[in-house]
Amino acid sequence: INVLKNTDGLAYLSFISDHGTAIYDDGKSLYGGNTKGNYNIAHFFWFNDLYHKQHPELIQKLSINKDKKITSECFVDTSLELSFIESKIKKGCSLLNDKFIEKQRLVKNGKVYDFDQDL
């Protein structure tokens, strides 16, 4: 982040984890187990001062959706929009959409589970 702070021009950093980790969540410590802790993933954005100054509306839109249930598929669409890249491959899952609609979150561990109902 310190490198990006000193970058001329717009800069942002986005991170998404490929998996979560259950460390005594619900009294369990399981690697690869079928628990919410193993499926909850870290996802964050950081913006430099110039990005905040020139595009506060985009950061506000992210803030509006910060507590919504999302999946990792939202990462690509959101990153394309934050980078001002036009693409025909968007899936309609950008966190910059102020009318963002939560989708059913499914996980697979031998069989398909509804994250919010079954785990």
For each of these PLM feature ranges, what is it?
Residues 1-119:
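Catalytic domains that recognize anionic headgroups
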